Amino acid sequence: MSHTVKIYDTCIGCTQCVRACPTDVLEMVPWDGCKAGQIASSPRVEDCVGCKRCETACPTDFLSVRVYLGAETTRSLGLAY
């Protein structure tokens, strides 16, 4: 099963989503596009259980995460954009 999680440039680099994730799917990586100089990344997306804790933890309600399960199915984690 193919997984891709996209976290768009609305991330403010606060690390709330990283700390909330029970399966350590997310991590912060250097990124010059925000004041914090870092952005959430998802190197271990195969471990995502779709719990939406990252969504709940996001203080700006702009975290955008999508999980793509193969070509036919797209499961949105329900995050605002």
UniProtKB/Swiss-Prot annotation:
Binding site for [4Fe-4S] cluster 2: C21, C48, C51, C54
Cofactor mode of binding and number, as noted: Binds 2 [4Fe-4S] clusters. Cluster 2 is most probably the spectroscopically characterized electron acceptor FA and cluster 1 is most probably FB.
Chain sites annotated for binding [4Fe-4S] cluster 1: C11, C14, C17, C58
Keywords in alphabetical order: 4Fe-4S, Chloroplast, Electron transport, Iron, Iron-sulfur, Membrane, Metal-binding, Oxidoreductase, Photosynthesis, Photosystem I, Plastid, Repeat, Thylakoid, Transport
Disulfide-linked positions: none
Catalytic activity: reduced [plastocyanin] + hnu + oxidized [2Fe-2S]-[ferredoxin] = oxidized [plastocyanin] + reduced [2Fe-2S]-[ferredoxin]
One MF annotation (Gene Ontology) recorded for this entry: 4 iron, 4 sulfur cluster binding
Cofactor(s) listed in the protein's UniProt record: [4Fe-4S] cluster
Enzyme Commission number: 1.97.1.12
Pfam families: Fer4_7 (PF12838)
A biological process from GO: photosynthetic electron transport in photosystem I
Membrane topology: Peripheral membrane protein
Role, per record: Apoprotein for the two 4Fe-4S centers FA and FB of photosystem I (PSI); essential for photochemical activity. FB is the terminal electron acceptor of PSI, donating electrons to ferredoxin. The C-terminus interacts with PsaA/B/D and helps assemble the protein into the PSI complex. Required for binding of PsaD and PsaE to PSI. PSI is a plastocyanin/cytochrome c6-ferredoxin oxidoreductase, converting photonic excitation into a charge separation, which transfers an electron from the donor P700 chlorophyll pair to the spectroscopically characterized acceptors A0, A1, FX, FA and FB in turn.
Subunit details: The eukaryotic PSI reaction center is composed of at least 11 subunits.
Name of the protein in question: Photosystem I iron-sulfur center
Organism of this sequence: Phaeodactylum tricornutum (strain CCAP 1055/1)
Organism lineage: Eukaryota, Sar, Stramenopiles, Ochrophyta, Bacillariophyta
